[in-house]
Every structure is written in structure tokens, then in C-alpha cells.
């Protein structure tokens, strides 16, 4: 059969319009800053604080999928910078996250790469990866705690709500 993909995600309990605007506003504050500075700040933040936030169940779930031979991707509304660290920690081979435009001098333009990896935008990135892997989303699992991920939950064949927000 087609390869299955396990997707793990965290973050965000606010409504789509509010969080999309917040993400874009946050990215704009980076205008002109070197991407290399962000890479270093996020690495430090991950090591000092964020790494400890990973729930043990996340690692166990990912390990089960890896042992079954599944492709594992981290699908997150976080930035690719932070998401990449979590993906590496979990052993995920793909990171689907918000990306920021960088100019030819290595500085942020203040614009996100669209669509944002949030709400319906997550479906876009999940479908694109599934297509690249020759997989069908109906063969994929997706783990989330957020109501904002309902569009992805509705598209995958194996949706899993983990410590769900009350709206799930």
C-alpha cells in the first residue's frame, strides 16, 4: 500500500483569523534582521526551554510509527526554525511549518511564505508532502491538541486528538 505519514503538531487555541494575523505581524517585526540571528536564538530557546515541553507520549507515538516503517513529518504552526528542532528530536524526516521570506543578503523581508501553515494551510502542506511521497492522506495519521487543526483531522484516515482543547 501507499506509505503512511504520521503528523505531530502542537500549539495554538485561538481562532484562525486572529492567529493568522498574529503570525504575519510577528514575521513583520523581523524585517531586516539576519536569518542567522534567528537560527541561533531559536536554537538557544529550544535547548534551554522548549525541549522540555515535549510530552513523553509524543516520542512514544512517533517511535511506534518509525518502527512500523512509516514516514514521519512534523506539521506545526510554529516556525520552521523551532519546528525543525522538534522534528530532529522526534526523528521526523520532514518539517512542515511556517517559513519566512529571506532576501539575497540573508535578511528577513518581513513576509511569510504563503499559505501560512495554520488551519486550512496545514492541509495544503500535508497534501503536498503526501503527493511527493506517493501517499494518500486517507492512509495517514495526524495527532493534534488543537481545534484549529480540524481541517487536517477531516482529511486524514487516522485522526488522533491528544490532550485536546475542549472544542475538539
What residue ranges belong to the model's regions?
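C-terminal cap/substrate-recognition subdomain and adjoining C-terminal extension
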Residues: 36, 40-41, 47-168
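A metal-dependent, Asp-based hydrolase signature
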Residues: 1-60, 64
